[in-house]
């Protein structure tokens, strides 16, 4: 798959934040009509401090049969700084993306969309590069306020930045901690909620695309795949 090159990656943290403030103005929100045929999940891991591993899994929907899996392992130059993870993880993701042959209709990232201090988490940032609808699904809160959702499957409450709705907090499994869902690019909040609900199977905490991407990341990291 091809992508649009928006900026260089050899940047200082200050330069990275300036780029985020520029790119955030380019994010578009729109309803996702109908159902996807193919959905991708993205997960990144760091086997060593300066080595990263990116995995993209493409699945048929609604069967969640894996049709393609690609990965990229390489050196990571940008330091770990909360709020700037796209500058650490983005280059590896894009190298993996170039290997992909199946075009997904929507891409789910293990990370944030617009639920981010500068409204540009990795799902939003990479969405601008790949120009495909993206959703961020994070296991913990980075930004925003919310009311705790009820303790039942698929209960959720909105995530706010002051009075602006920037996503939702969804309890996908009774008794489990909620996940944090926010639109990345080319999709809106309501569509993101609808799709993540439909991607999450009973008894699972995470949506299948990122759950399977994480499983393969761990297998590759251990040399089991």
From Swiss-Prot:
Subcellular location: Cytoplasm
Domain of life per record: Bacteria
Main location: cytoplasm
Binding site for Mg(2+): 43, 110
Keywords linked to the UniProt accession: Cytoplasm, DNA damage, DNA repair, Endonuclease, Hydrolase, Magnesium, Metal-binding, Nuclease
Pfam families to which the protein is assigned, alphabetical: Endonuclease_5
Keyword Nuclease: yes
Presence of the UniProt keyword NAD in the record: no
Annotated site location: Interaction with target DNA: 80
Function (record text): DNA repair enzyme involved in the repair of deaminated bases. Selectively cleaves double-stranded DNA at the second phosphodiester bond 3' to a deoxyinosine leaving behind the intact lesion on the nicked DNA.
HAMAP family: Endonuclease_5
PANTHER family from the UniProt entry: ENDONUCLEASE V
Family note: Belongs to the endonuclease V family.
Protein name as catalogued: Endonuclease V
Species name: Thermotoga neapolitana (strain ATCC 49049 / DSM 4359 / NBRC 107923 / NS-E)
């Amino acid at each position: 798959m091809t992508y649009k090159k928006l900026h260089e990656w050899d940047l200082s943290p200050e330069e990275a934040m300036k780029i985020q403030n520029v790119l955030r103005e380019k994010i578009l929100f729109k309803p996702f009509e109908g159902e996807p045929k193919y959905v991708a999940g993205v997960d990144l891991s760091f086997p060593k401090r300066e080595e990263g591993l990116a995995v993209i899994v493409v699945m048929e929907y609604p069967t969640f049969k894996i049709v393609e899996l690609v990965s990229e392992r390489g050196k990571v130059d940008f330091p770990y700084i909360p709020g700037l993870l796209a500058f650490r993880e983005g280059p590896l993701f894009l190298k993996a993306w170039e290997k992909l042959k199946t075009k997904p209709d929507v891409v789910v990232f293990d990370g944030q969309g617009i639920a981010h201090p500068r409204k540009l988490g990795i799902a939003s940032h990479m969405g601008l590069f790949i120009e495909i609808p993206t959703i961020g699904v994070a296991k913990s809160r980075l930004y925003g306020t919310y009311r705790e959702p009820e303790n039942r499957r698929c209960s959720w409450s909105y995530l706010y930045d002051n009075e602006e709705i920037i996503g939702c907090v969804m309890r996908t499994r009774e008794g489990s901690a909620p996940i944090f869902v926010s639109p990345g690019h080319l999709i809106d909040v309501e569509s993101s909620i609808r799709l993540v609900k439909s991607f999450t199977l009973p008894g699972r905490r995470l949506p299948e695309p990122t759950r399977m991407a994480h499983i393969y990341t761990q297998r590759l990291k251990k040399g089991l795949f």
